[in-house]
Design a protein with these regions (language model features):
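Extracellular/periplasmic ectodomains of large secreted or surface enzymes and adhesion receptors
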Residues: 334-383, 445-453
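Single conserved hydrophobic/aromatic residue that forms the stacking wall/gate
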Residues: 2-8, 12
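Repeat-mediated protein-protein interaction surfaces in helical alpha-solenoids
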Residues: 5-6, 32-41, 65-75, 111-125, ...
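TPR/TPR-like (Sel1-like) alpha-helical repeat modules
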Residues: 42-46, 79, 94-115, 141-147, ...
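Catalytic glycan-binding domains that act on GlcNAc-containing polysaccharides
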Residues: 15-18, 22, 35-46, 185, ...
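Alpha-helical segment of the N-proximal tetratricopeptide repeat
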Residues: 1, 138-142, 200, 204, ...
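Residue at a conserved register position within TPR or TPR-like alpha-solenoid repeats
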Residues: 28, 61, 93, 143, ...
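Generic helix N-cap/helix-start motif at coil->alpha-helix transitions
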Residues: 13-19, 31-33, 45-54, 64-69, ...
Length: 453
């Protein structure tokens, strides 16, 4: 009937409008108002990248255009996602009479807020009463550790004199500017051993290819978390220098630099422990020490690719100490993940001429399949493919993959990606699933026809 076809047409138009609005709201520097964001979020809470939309919505808030009570209500029980949002929420609390809570939020938000040149001037003036020198120093430290050199440069002039000299040196080291030596010489004595300054000096030397003088810094500093401030940042430099020292056959120093990392958790900790174990086993012939490092690595990872790596290298370490039963147990552990490199190496250790099979992919309930393919975002994906705009389906497909994992949404999202010839997105969806030990091998390792030239 005419009315049902016009109703269908209206639904279709609304779906297209939603998608265009979503893309618009995700574009930085757009002209949308906070209310545009609010309307979209109220109607489309099931869209992809909603956290990012909320983050950008916070940057549209202002107590001049939205009442403080409305701002407080909008955040509700949720913490702001941005430093900017924290400041505006803090200002709203002050305006309704809660000065303590408001000031605390402004101070916290100021440290991490993403501010343009004009916004920095504006908020610096606006929050003059609530911010002190300490807040400026904290912001400078945050920006410096994150390598935000342009934002740091804008802030330096507002710092107390001794800190201005310290952060000017850090800024020049970061930006490889002229006058680095003089800037370092100008740093007050009390900051000569500042962790951030040493980190930026190390990075500067390493980028210039100065392995020996980089090593000098790493051997001289204290290696505890308290001193290093961001041991995870230091790790990247340690790893590069440590490998460079292996090429120079300086194995003991290489081990010392990789193992004195000052971390106790996180992905960088796991990387440091694996590398230290590998150096101990392969270059220092010390399987006992290697074992401890590999155990630390194994106990701090969860992805199959890393679990198989840890188990395989534990197998190697126990093999070296002659504990064959323990060695084989660890190899067996690694073979639980046969789609990984180390899982396959471990399988060959136990079955030198053996063949292995992968598990079958999961079956999908036909009812759920129909429900899935009727979703608005699925239809949008097909439309984008027809319009040759399939690059925009990436986040949509990843979002759809989480719809109902138990019923097979990951498989169906990968199938959808394959049907619009985005094998790369199908692989992404399957790879993310594999991190949680769910293997969809048909889509993770697609068989494609040979390209014709």
């Amino acid at each position: 009937t005419l009315s049902s076809s016009s109703a269908a047409s209206d639904v279709y138009k609304r779906q297209i409008y939603n998608f265009i609005q979503w893309r618009h709201l995700l574009t930085s520097g757009n002209q949308a108002s906070f209310y545009d964001y609010q309307v979209f979020l109220n109607k489309n809470s099931d869209y992809p990248r909603i956290s990012r939309v909320k983050y950008l919505a916070e940057h549209k808030l202002s107590t001049e255009s939205v009442s403080p009570k409305k701002i407080i209500k909008w955040f509700g029980e949720n913490d702001p996602l941005s430093g900017y949002g924290k400041m505006i929420l803090g200002e709203s609390h002050i305006l309704i009479g809660d000065k303590n809570k408001g000031t605390k939020l402004i101070k916290e938000g100021w440290v991490t807020a993403d501010l343009s040149k004009n916004e920095l001037k504006y908020f610096r003036k606006k929050y003059k009463k609530y911010l002190n020198a300490d807040d400026y120093i904290k912001r400078a430290d945050y920006l410096a550790w994150n390598g935000d050199r342009w934002d740091l440069q804008r802030l330096i002039r507002y710092l107390p004199k001794d800190y201005e000299l310290l952060y000017n040196a850090r800024h020049l080291l970061m930006s490889k500017g002229y006058g680095v030596d003089q800037a370092i010489a100008n740093v007050p004595q009390k900051f000569k051993n500042d962790a951030g300054l040493n980190y930026d000096r190390l990075k500067w030397r390493r980028k210039k290819g100065r392995v020996d003088s980089s090593t000098e810094i790493l051997l001289k500093i204290r290696n505890d978390k308290e001193y290093l401030v961001r041991p995870d940042k230091w790790w990247k430099e340690r790893e590069i220098i440590s490998r460079a020292l292996l090429y120079k056959k300086k194995y003991e120093i290489s081990y010392k630099i990789s193992s004195n990392h000052g971390m106790t958790e996180g992905s960088e900790y796991a990387a440091a422990e694996w590398m230290s174990g590998w150096i101990a086993l392969s270059f220092l012939n010390d399987p006992m020490t290697a074992k401890d490092h590999f155990k630390n690595f194994y106990e701090n990872v969860s992805y199959p690719i890393s679990l198989s790596r840890g188990a395989y290298w534990l197998g190697r370490a126990y093999e070296k100490t002659g504990e064959i039963e323990l060695s084989n147990n660890w190899y067996r552990e690694a073979t639980k993940y046969l789609t990984t490199y180390y899982g396959q190496l471990a399988f060959l250790k136990l079955n030198p001429n053996g063949k292995f099979e992968l598990e079958k992919d999961m079956e999908i309930d036909p009812k759920y399949r129909i429900q899935f393919f009727n979703k608005e975002l699925v239809k949008i994906s097909y439309l984008l493919d027809e319009l040759k705009k399939d690059k925009y389906t990436k986040h949509i497909l990843r979002h759809l993959a989480n719809d109902n994992i138990a019923k097979g949404s990951e498989v169906l999202a990968a199938e959808l990606a394959t049907s619009i010839n985005r094998y790369d997105f199908a692989i992404q969806v399957s790879k993310i699933a594999s991190y949680q030990k769910r293997f969809h091998n048909k889509y993770n390792y697609p068989i494609i026809s040979t390209p014709k030239y």
